[in-house]
């Protein structure tokens, strides 16, 4: 049986892994487009749920699942939550996102 692990990455960890290395980023993008062209990527439209507030629908969260095949073979989902109220409140982020692979 394969042991499962959870690894939480902070922004610093992602940067250290090469996020700001444009050669590495472009190589990953090129590979992604190649796999997409071969039909190896499943990327359905996002599902959006609006959250009502006292005045109108100004907040929402989205789920964006995807699967990358080929030699990568990994599935994941991005959850994104946006709040107009947060955007008008100093000191807190407009949106909070999480990617699960």
Name each region found by the language model.
Residues 1-101:
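N-terminal ligand-binding/catalytic initiation module
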